């Protein structure tokens, strides 16, 4: 039988703690900081509840309650695989793959294993999916664009705007086919 160790407690002034957090963030990239008020202000589903937290990487923020544990089904498009021989985005190929990925992410909701009923309830009620990109720096290398340049920012805007538009379009088409999710109205 092991006795739990008593952890030493200490007091730290709020400014000192804030400086320590910011120093660590600057030096290591951790801890990640997310402000709940900003998340709730910008949430497209304010009508469904309050965002209390994010996932570990803070890439998603979803509503939680006693009946719901936030779940998100995430996927990425590998941008370098969507560049043609001249280094331009192949928009037809990108649209085909984004559309397929959105359908697959929606299918994951139906075939997923849920360890707790609150996760299943949340996933079926909101059907949350997220699509991002990966390989951005590889794409810049292929395009011979320096990472810290205005051209890199422009390419980020172009590629993410296309992926976002195509994903929203694919999701809309899927809703016409399968119906909207139950918490959509609001």
Where are these regions (language model features)?
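Single conserved hydrophobic/aromatic residue that forms the stacking wall/gate
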Residues: 1-12
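Active-site-proximal structural scaffolding
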Residues: 14-17, 26, 67-72, 98-101, ...
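A general alpha-helix detector
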Residues: 20, 135-139, 155
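Extended amphipathic alpha-helical segments enriched in small hydrophobics
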Residues: 127-146
């Amino acid at each position: 039988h092991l006795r739990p160790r008593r952890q030493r407690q200490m007091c730290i002034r709020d400014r000192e703690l804030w400086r320590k957090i910011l120093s660590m963030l600057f030096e290591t990239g951790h801890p990640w900081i997310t402000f709940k008020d900003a998340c709730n202000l910008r949430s497209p589903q304010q009508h469904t509840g309050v965002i209390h937290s994010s996932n570990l990487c803070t890439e998603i923020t979803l509503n939680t309650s006693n009946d719901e544990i936030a779940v998100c089904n995430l996927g990425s498009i590998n941008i370098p695989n969507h560049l043609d021989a001249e280094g331009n985005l192949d928009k037809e190929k990108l649209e085909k793959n984004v559309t397929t990925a959105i359908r697959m992410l929606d299918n994951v909701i139906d075939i997923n294993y849920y360890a707790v009923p609150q996760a299943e309830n949340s996933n079926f009620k909101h059907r949350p999916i997220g699509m991002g990109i990966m390989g951005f720096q590889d794409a810049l290398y292929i395009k011979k664009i320096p990472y810290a340049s205005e051209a890199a920012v422009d390419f980020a805007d172009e590629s993410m705007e296309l992926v976002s538009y195509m994903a929203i379009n694919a999701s809309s088409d899927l809703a016409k086919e399968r119906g909207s999710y139950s918490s959509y109205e609001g």
